[in-house]
């Protein structure tokens, strides 16, 4: 699946229905462009601070859930710890794509598809992943507190991922 944004989704919907864009579609497209500077400002801060955000989120996660890094924990051993950091990077990177696109579909197709089953089969506690996503969300909000309405665009991808991971599980 290709990456999509709000505009592609709007146009695809109208194209599939064989309709011209109506005032609702035009309003939504205008909103996408009107909020672009905010969304791009957020992503610029994420990009500039990604290593620090990942480091802070992982430290806070392991502080809250020390069993993850103890023997037999899911992040115990260098290989598992590195895999955990890699996964944190994936969540952060794809959340930033979602923020720019103003669309969560990239999260379903690129991050969440099969991930829940993989984590369940490996015994990775989904509650820890949800905690991690909450930590990432709050760290980004803190770093973007000077951007008006940043929280609206930061909440959406992280809450979406948490919801999908929690469905019928945690």
Curated annotation (Swiss-Prot):
Pfam family, one: Phycobilisome
Residues that, per the record, bind (2R,3E)-phycocyanobilin: 84
Gene designation: apcF
Family: Belongs to the phycobiliprotein family.
Principal localisation: plastid
Quaternary structure, from the entry: Heterodimer of an alpha and a beta chain.
Organism: Cyanidium caldarium (Red alga)
PTM comment, free text: Contains one covalently linked bilin chromophore.
Keywords: Antenna complex, Bile pigment, Chloroplast, Chromophore, Electron transport, Membrane, Methylation, Photosynthesis, Phycobilisome, Plastid, Thylakoid, Transport
Record localization: Plastid, Chloroplast thylakoid membrane
Record's protein name: Allophycocyanin subunit beta-18
N4-methylasparagine carried by residues: 74
GO BP terms: photosynthesis
Signal peptide: none
């Amino acid at each position: 699946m290709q990456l999509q944004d709000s505009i592609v989704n709007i146009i695809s919907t109208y194209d599939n229905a064989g309709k011209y864009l109506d005032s609702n579609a035009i309003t939504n497209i205008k909103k996408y462009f009107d909020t672009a500077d905010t969304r791009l400002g957020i992503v610029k801060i994420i990009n500039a601070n990604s290593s620090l955000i990942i480091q802070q989120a992982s430290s806070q996660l392991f502080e809250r859930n020390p069993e993850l890094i103890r023997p037999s924990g899911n992040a115990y051993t260098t290989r598992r710890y590195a895999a955990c950091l890699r996964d944190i990077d994936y969540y952060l990177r794809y959340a930033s794509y979602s923020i720019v696109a103003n669309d969560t579909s990239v999260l379903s197709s690129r991050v969440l598809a099969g991930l829940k089953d993989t984590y369940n089969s490996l015994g990775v506690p989904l509650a820890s992943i949800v905690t991690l996503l909450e930590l990432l969300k709050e760290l980004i909000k803190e770093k973007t507190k000077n951007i008006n309405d940043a929280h609206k665009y930061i909440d959406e991808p992280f809450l979406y991922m948490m919801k999908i991971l929690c469905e019928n599980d945690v």
